[in-house]
């Protein structure tokens, strides 16, 4: 299981706090998770909201994104996330004024940009190969998990690299699962479990293990971390790192849509140094 360290950054307002996950990936592949603390946004988005689609003041969001880019010293690459299974490839430098592509996964071999996934309960999943030649990031709520966003992201990595051995390449992948809502706080209906059953991305026993029945009929508590880990393992990815940090419980550091509805988004980032 990964551990993390915390850094305090001087933002000119209050100290911005970021988390640096520790994992077994190549040393020149870097990870960073932002928090709520230390940005320019006013309540209810206070204060380091990085999402443009939540009705926050756009000038505040741009200042918050600039703060993040200054810390990483790379150009940003964000997605217009819509709970899809679409994956895009970043093959040339992205101009900051261009609209973000509509997708929920991205791969890149460029060392000029960082990839950022915005969440407030969904899973951010960051990936790289064992040599550190390619990085990827995807946004995975229950719909994305059930419909194959992880599979599509890894498929895009394989198709870009064209390794001699597809399975050997996949087995060498490293995955980091960032903060998201924990099972005890994520109640879902029967239709969510049925979606996983119908799509058969993992076995029935694994699905049952990730859905704990609630006292109410046709209600379950779903384990997004467990589902993502099972999917990755099924594909052959066993170097999976997560701290299982709960975005719902940790109101000091993370935004949570289930907790607050009108709220911001934090970012999980990966890049090649």
What is each model feature region?
Residues 1-273:
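Active-site microenvironment for binding and transforming phosphate-containing groups
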